[in-house]
Amino acid sequence: MAKNLIPSDVQLEITQIKSAIGGKQNQRDTLRSLGLKRIGHTVVRTADAVTVGMLNTVPHLVKVEEAK
């Protein structure tokens, strides 16, 4: 779902599913900015333009679902 996101007022559950070790520095910084610290860690963020842009940077490291 991370590739088809558009900015809106929807709440997103973002879960880190892969490690940032060996990744580029900007990808590690993006995960930290999203509030993700370890594999399996989940945060809830609004799908604003900033968050969608960050998710488009690391789609291979996170799983995105609509929050319930």
From Swiss-Prot:
Does Ribosomal protein appear among the keywords? yes
Q: Which UniProt keywords apply?
A: Ribonucleoprotein, Ribosomal protein
Which residues, by range, are in coiled-coil regions?
Answer: none
One GO biological process this protein is involved in is: translation
Gene3D superfamilies assigned: Ribosomal protein L30, ferredoxin-like fold domain
**InterPro entries linked to this entry:** Ribo_uL30_ferredoxin-like_sf, Ribosomal_uL30_bac-type, Ribosomal_uL30_CS, Ribosomal_uL30_ferredoxin-like
May I have one GO cellular component term?
Answer: cytosolic large ribosomal subunit
Care to name a GO molecular-function term for this sequence? structural constituent of ribosome
Q: Which domain of life is it from?
A: Bacteria
Q: Which family does it belong to?
A: Belongs to the universal ribosomal protein uL30 family.
Q: Which PANTHER family match?
A: LARGE RIBOSOMAL SUBUNIT PROTEIN UL30M, MITOCHONDRIAL RIBOSOMAL PROTEIN L30
Subunit text: Part of the 50S ribosomal subunit.
* Record-given protein name: Large ribosomal subunit protein uL30
Q: Which organism was this protein described from?
A: Arthrobacter sp. (strain FB24)
